[in-house]
Structures are given as structure tokens and as C-alpha cells.
Amino acid sequence: MDAIKKKMLAMKMEKENAVDRAEQNEQKLRDTEEQKAKIEEDLNNLQKKCANLENDFDNVNEQLQEAMAKLETSEKRVTEMEQEVSGTTRKITLLEEDLERNEERLQTATERLEEASKAADESERGARVLESRSLADDERIDQLEAQLKEAKYIAEDAERKYDEAARKLAITEVDLERAEARLEAAEAKILELEEELKVVGNNMKSLEISEQEASQREDSYEETIRDLTQRLKDAENRATEAERTVSKLQKEVDRLEDELLAEKEKYKAISDELDQTFAELAGY
């Protein structure tokens, strides 16, 4: 009887242990199911993040392509402006040569004017000797003296205008040098943007290394694109300013050419008057 009781007690204890183990296994099963659900949720979130990262990568890549296209357009504009500046520089060189030639003509005209003045002085002495001549001769001498005075005034005025033209040409050269400096700065900025774009391209290749690193770099890429876009706008603004400067220089060159043409015509008129004066003086 005692053996049966002991056996029943052992069976009861074994039953209780089995129940405890069953409850523990059920709890472990519930914990495992919860962990599985959490892992599945984390996996879904990770897949969504990966999809978002792929979309962000596509957007960043598209912005990069747009920045490269704008950069190429800016390079073309800078090349065109360099060609315009080169042509303007050539015109200014020709203008300087023309000014030098006109300065030589001015010197020649001045020398001839001095000779005419000496001849006028001789005419005055001759007029005093020939005071007995007719009133018509006196009026002719007065007319010649007035023409000589007018010729002197025209020559002095032409000399002042040439000095003014030379001063404006110097100012134009300074503006041209500034425009060239701006173009060089724009070209240097474009080279800098190209290097930064290369760096961005290399960084993008490592975007897929890990989800954490890609998420950390996303903000940096967007900031880099905004910075590149701003710098590209700055380069375009500088290029626009350089275009306005080139246009202004071209207008100044055209105006100087018109002034030179007018001065040439005045000099021709002075030369014709001097020739006529010499011819008239020779007649006395």
C-alpha cells in the first residue's frame, strides 16, 4: 500500500512537472511568435526604408544630371564670352593703332599750323609795308588772320578731344581687364564645381553599403546638391554680368570709332583749310 502511495505521489509530481514544462513551452512559443511578428515588422520597415532610399537615390541622381546639364550650358556660355572678349580686345588694339596714327597726323597738322602762323606774321609785316594798298587787300589779310585763328582753335579743340578719347580708351581697357578677371573667376568656379560633382558621384557609388550609412548621407547629398545649384546660379549670374560688360565695352568701342571718324573728318577739313591758306599766302 505504501508503495502504491509513493508511486502515485511520484506520478503526481511528474504530472505537475509536466504541466509546468508545458506552460513554460507555451510561454516560450508565445514569446517566439511575438519575436517573429516583431522581426517581420522590422523586416517590412527595413524594406520600406530601402524602397525610400532607392527613390531618394533616383531623385538625387536626377538632380545631379540636371546640375551637370546646367554646368555644360554655363561652360558653353563662358566659351562664347571668351570669344567675344577676344574680338573686343582685337578691336581695341586696332583702335589704339588708329589713335596713334591720328596723333601723328595731329602733330603734323600742328607743325603745319605753326608754319602757317609764321607765314601769317610775315604777312602782317608785309601788310604794314603795303599799308598803301587798297582796302580790299587789307580786308583779305584780316580774313586770312581770322581763318588762321579759327584753324588754331579747331586744332586745339581736336587735341582736347583726342586726349578725352585716349582717357576713355584707358577706362575701357580697365573695364575689359575686369571682365576678363571675372571670366577667369567663373572658369575657376566651374572647375571647382566639376571636382565637387566628381566627389558627389564617387560618394553616390557607396550609397548602398548599408542602410544606416545611406540614411546618414542622404541629408549630406541634398545639401551638396543645393550648394552646387547655388554655386551654378552664382556662375550664371557672373556670366550674365560679364555679357553685360562685354556689351557695354562694345558700345563704348562703337562710340569711340564714331568719334574717331568725326575727328578724321575735322582733321581733313583743317588740312584742306591749311592748304588753301598756304596757297593764298604764297600768292602774296
Swiss-Prot record:
On the tree of life, the source organism's domain of life is: Eukaryota
For this UniProt record, the keywords arranged alphabetically read as follows: Allergen, Coiled coil, Muscle protein, Repeat
Which biological processes are named by the entry's GO terms?
regulation of muscle contraction
Pfam families, alphabetized: Tropomyosin
Extract the PROSITE patterns matched here.
Answer: TROPOMYOSIN
| InterPro entries named among the record's database cross-references | Tropomyosin
Subunit architecture: Homodimer.
Comment on protein domains = The molecule is in a coiled coil structure that is formed by 2 polypeptide chains. The sequence exhibits a prominent seven-residues periodicity.
Q: What is this protein called?
A: Tropomyosin
Tell me what organism the protein belongs to.
Haliotis diversicolor (Abalone)
